[in-house]
């Protein structure tokens, strides 16, 4: 049997399954990474160091020296004030010495200043410590640093020559000769002599030290000295130049008084005038000489 098309069950049209569209990823709000804290300004660091130093000295005052806590606080004071040492050491950069060595020496001065500082005197610690630190560094250069620059190779060779000299002195019971040192180190005698000469530049020679050779005077004995008569020669030459400007009688009175060492009474007898008149003539001569000297000057 044929079913009319109108009455045939209608098959619903198949619909394509809807595929869900992928959702657009949400943009998270962009957050800037936190900026690092600004470095403290030098003035701020200095103020912090001063404040910390003041607190540490307050703690140190109530502690027994030699105890573990005392050493801890003392070490913190040293650490906090090392920038002061570096600042002082930087003033000596031109000395061609390793800066680490200079800082170590300055640290000794810092420790001495810490041990001597009294907070109750009302003085800031940097003000108190700086002269001690600088003084320690200057003492180091004065006592340990050579006065003349020595090439590095010659300096290293000098150390070897010095060690060989000590060994040979112990071995032979006497100071070794230059050839013995040269043979020991396998270097030339000229190099040994150069090293010995370079070694002398490490320390200044005392003016009172005896020189090589028997009976040789020290440097101080060979230095010239100022002859006390030189000033007298200069004065006499000046007076002679001014004296010719005086009247002849006044010239004679001055010569009798100061060159012949006569008294005023002796001069009055020599010239046949009163002692009072001699005194007035001397005073007048001095006034004229002073006036002439001012004009010459």
From Swiss-Prot:
Organism of provenance: Kitasatospora aureofaciens (Streptomyces aureofaciens)
Composition bias type Basic and acidic residues, residue spans: 23-33
NCBIfam families: SigBFG (TIGR02980), sigma70-ECF (TIGR02937)
InterPro entries per the UniProt record, alphabetical: RNA_pol_sigma-70_dom, RNA_pol_sigma-B/F/G, RNA_pol_sigma70, RNA_pol_sigma70_r2, RNA_pol_sigma70_r3, RNA_pol_sigma70_r4, RNA_pol_sigma_r2, RNA_pol_sigma_r3/r4-like
Name listed for the protein in its UniProt record: RNA polymerase sigma-F factor
GO MF term list: DNA binding; sigma factor activity
Family the entry assigns: Belongs to the sigma-70 factor family. SigB subfamily.
Ranges where the record places region Disordered: 1-46
Pfam families for this protein: Sigma70_r2, Sigma70_r3, Sigma70_r4
Motif Polymerase core binding: positions: 101-114
Highest taxon listed in the record's lineage: Bacteria
């Amino acid at each position: 049997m044929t079913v009319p098309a109108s009455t045939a069950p209608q098959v619903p049209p198949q619909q394509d399954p809807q595929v869900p569209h992928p959702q657009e990823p949400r943009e998270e709000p962009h957050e800037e990474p936190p900026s690092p804290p600004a470095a403290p300004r030098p003035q701020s660091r200095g103020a912090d160091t001063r404040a910390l130093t003041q607190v540490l000295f307050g703690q140190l005052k109530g502690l027994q020296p030699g105890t573990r806590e005392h050493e801890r606080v003392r070490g913190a004071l040293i650490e906090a004030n090392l920038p002061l040492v570096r600042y002082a050491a930087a003033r000596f950069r031109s000395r061609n010495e390793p800066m680490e060595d200079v800082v170590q020496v300055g640290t000794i001065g810092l420790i001495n200043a810490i041990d001597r500082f009294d907070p109750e005197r009302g003085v800031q610690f940097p003000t108190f410590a700086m002269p001690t630190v600088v003084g320690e560094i200057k003492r180091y250069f004065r006592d340990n640093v050579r006065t003349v620059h020595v090439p590095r190779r010659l300096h290293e060779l000098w150390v070897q020559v010095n060690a060989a000299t000590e060994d040979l002195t112990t071995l032979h019971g006497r100071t070794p000769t230059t050839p013995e040192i040269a043979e020991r180190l396998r270097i030339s005698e000229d190099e040994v002599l150069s090293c010995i000469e370079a070694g002398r530049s490490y320390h200044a020679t005392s003016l009172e030290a005896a020189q090589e050779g028997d009976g040789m005077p020290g440097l101080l004995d060979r230095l010239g000295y100022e002859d006390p008569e030189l000033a007298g020669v200069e004065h006499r030459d000046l007076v002679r130049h001014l004296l010719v400007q005086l009247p002849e009688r006044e010239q004679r009175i001055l010569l009798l008084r100061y060159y012949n060492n006569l008294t005023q009474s002796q001069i009055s007898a020599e010239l046949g005038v009163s002692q009072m008149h001699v005194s007035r003539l001397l005073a007048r001569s001095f006034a004229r000489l002073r006036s002439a000297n001012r004009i010459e000057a």
